[in-house]
């Protein structure tokens, strides 16, 4: 299998465009609709209502491994990190965003040699906590990265202290991450940030595994 070190950018793209002047932005698209000259950076969005603001970095990504993503359920539920660096928005915030609008998901990758690939999904949503923040993702378009997320469709979110995968093992504990694991994963974006390929232990890293390729996302 081929292995490559990749940088990943995860982008939620609204299918239905909103954002009227004077209305608090629900997500990053509202901010850029108001002024498309704004650079990537820290902004406040209001996924629940105009009294509850959440700082986000548009576009969020794993950048340098400075933030520990091996965390318990409560952190993943509410969110953690810094809006001007690495960040996890929070499962509840993702759920509230998906209640308000329909979204696409773009997984965009580029290695340190400038090679680019992406995977796009025309429908992305996260269910409520009572359903384990279940992932719904369909409508795959291949931009060279392959479909590493399809097998995770319909799965509940798991952390090492809240195992909700369908494996007999605790996938989050085994692969040092947190995700919508199945048995266990074809992608592990919240895994260990590593500099380069590490052969047999690649599965614990920030990985996008496709047919014929094993891409380690940095």
What spans do the regions from the language model cover?
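Mature extracellular or lumenal effector domains of secreted proteins
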Residues: 1-218
């Amino acid at each position: 299998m081929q292995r490559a070190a990749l940088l990943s950018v995860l982008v939620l793209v609204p299918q239905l465009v909103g954002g009227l002047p004077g209305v608090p932005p629900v997500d990053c698209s509202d901010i850029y609709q108001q002024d498309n000259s704004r650079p990537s950076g820290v902004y406040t969005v209001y996924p629940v209502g105009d009294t509850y603001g959440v700082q986000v970095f548009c576009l969020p990504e794993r950048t340098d491994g400075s933030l520990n993503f091996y965390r318990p359920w409560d952190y993943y539920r509410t969110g953690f990190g810094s809006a001007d660096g690495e960040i996890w928005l929070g499962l509840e915030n993702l759920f509230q965003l998906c209640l308000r609008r329909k979204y696409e998901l773009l997984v965009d990758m580029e290695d340190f040699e400038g090679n680019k690939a992406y995977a796009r999904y025309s429908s992305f949503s996260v269910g409520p906590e009572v359903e384990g923040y279940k992932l719904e993702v369909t409508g795959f378009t291949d931009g060279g990265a392959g479909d590493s997320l399809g097998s995770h469709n319909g799965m509940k979110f798991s952390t090492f202290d809240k195992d909700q995968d369908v494996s007999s093992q605790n996938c989050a504990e085994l692969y040092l991450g947190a995700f919508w694991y199945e048995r266990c994963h074809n992608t592990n974006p919240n895994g260990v940030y590593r500099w380069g390929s590490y052969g047999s232990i690649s599965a614990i890293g920030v990985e996008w595994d496709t047919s014929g390729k094993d891409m380690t996302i940095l």
